[in-house]
Amino acid sequence: MFTPTIYFPEIDSKTQTMPLEDSKLHHLRKVLRMKDFDNVNISNGQGQLFIGKFVNDSVQINTQKNFQRKNKICIFIPYLREKNRFRFMIEKLTELNVNRIFIGKTENTQNTKVDTLKIHNWALSALEQSGTPFFPKIEIVETIDYTIFDTCFDITGRVLKNDSPKVNTFAIGPEGGWTPEELSNFKFKYKLSDFSLRTDTAAISAVSLMM
C-alpha cells in the first residue's frame, strides 16, 4: 500500500508530533483521501525517514529509519528549454538519489530563463512521490567548473564497458553536443551509445550505470 512521504528538512529525532501546513493537509485529505491513523512518512532529505500516523492534522512520529547513500553521484547538466523534459530529468535524478546536481550553461546551451524555485519544487515532488530519504543539493552555476568535472559523456568518447572504472562526478552535454574546446578541458571522455542521446536520456542512463 502506498504511504505518502512529506519533505520537512527541519525535523529531527526529538520531534514527536509535527503539525502540517494547509497545503499539505489539503493534499493528504482531498487528493490522497487520507484519514486519521493512516501511515505517513516524513523525510528530512539527509537520509532519515520518520514513520508516523496522520492524526488531528498532524503526524505523530512512531519510529525513525536511517539510510546511508550507496554512492555520492555529482552531475553537471545543461538547461533544457523544453520544460517537460527538464522536469522529467530533475525528477528522475532525484529518484535515483543523485547527491549534487549542477545546472549551468555550455557553449551550445540555448538561452533559457531558469526558475530555481520551480526546479526545487520538481525535486521536492519527486522525493515525496518516491519516498526517498535523500534530497539533492541543487546548484545553479554560470559555467561548468572543470576542476570539479574532469569527466564527461560524449559520442566521441571511449566505450563504457562493464569493467570500466566507476566515476561519481561527471558532466552531461547539451543537445548540440560539446564544442571541441569544451571537450579539450575534460581528462576523461566516455560514450553511452554509438548514437546521439538526448540530454535527459544521457543523464539518467549515466547515473543508472554509475550507481
Please place each PLM-identified region on the residue numbering.
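N-terminal positively charged helical leader segments and presequences
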Residues: 1-66
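Glycine/charged-rich beta-loop-alpha catalytic/anionic-binding loops adjacent to active sites
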Residues: 19, 70-74, 167-168, 184-192
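Short, acidic/turn-prone active-site loops that include or flank metal/cofactor-
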Residues: 65-66, 157-159, 174-177, 194-198
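RNA substrate-binding interface of SAM-dependent RNA methyltransferases
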Residues: 67-148
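A mid-sequence, solvent-exposed acidic-amphipathic segment
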Residues: 139-165
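A C-terminal functional module that forms or caps the active site or interfaces directly
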Residues: 165-180
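Structured adenosyl-cofactor binding patch, chiefly the S-adenosyl-L-methionine
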Residues: 180-211
